[in-house]
């Protein structure tokens, strides 16, 4: 009996764009490609250092796609994103190539009318201001899930 291994792709647009965060969670860095998710907006969230996306016509979110994500890794990402996000299937445009369209998964903020969403979240600002503390939190999260130790 041969088992079929399902591989997934996941569009990430926040803290998971940082290789160090992904390495702590998956114990590896998957193959990636830059991508854009049309008709969504990336918001900051009051009191949080990570972003949320919700549908927004005529807007787009830049991020990247993680390729070759296993079922187990997808479960880890589901746990990491928690109940505040819903995993949804979306279509992104790969920006490294010829704007190829790709069906993929992403995590959308569950509460679409959340009054705590505001402005636009900035990855570069997050890296400078919050990444160090976020890595510490992510490492603790990985340890709680008994994930394999990363080199970080």
UniProtKB/Swiss-Prot annotation:
UniProt-annotated catalytic positions: 81 (proton acceptor)
Source superkingdom: Eukaryota
GO molecular function: acyltransferase activity
Induction statement: Down-regulated by biological and chemical stimuli.
Keywords: Acyltransferase, Transferase
Gene3D superfamilies: 6.10.250.210, Gamma-glutamyl cyclotransferase-like
Tissues in which the UniProt entry reports expression: Expressed mainly in leaves.
InterPro entries, alphabetized: AIG2-like, AIG2-like_dom, GGCT-like, GGCT-like_sf
Binding site for substrate: 13-18
The protein, known as: AIG2-like protein D
Source organism phylogeny: Eukaryota, Viridiplantae, Streptophyta, Embryophyta, Tracheophyta
């Amino acid at each position: 009996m041969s088992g079929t291994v399902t591989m997934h792709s996941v569009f990430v647009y926040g803290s998971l764009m940082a290789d160090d965060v992904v390495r702590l969670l998956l114990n590896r860095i998957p193959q990636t490609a830059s991508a854009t998710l049309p008709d969504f907006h990336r918001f900051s969230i009051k009191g949080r250092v990570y972003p949320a996306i919700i549908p927004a016509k005529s807007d787009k979110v830049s991020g990247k796609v993680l390729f070759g994500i296993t079922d187990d890794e997808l479960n880890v990402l589901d746990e990491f994103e928690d109940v505040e996000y819903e995993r949804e299937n979306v279509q992104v445009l790969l920006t490294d190539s010829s704007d190829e369209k790709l069906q993929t998964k992403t995590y959308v903020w569950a509460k679409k009318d959340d009054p705590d969403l505001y402005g636009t979240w900035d990855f570069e600002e997050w890296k400078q201001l919050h990444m160090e503390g976020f890595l510490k939190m992510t490492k603790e999260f990985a340890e709680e899930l008994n994930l394999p130790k990363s080199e970080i």
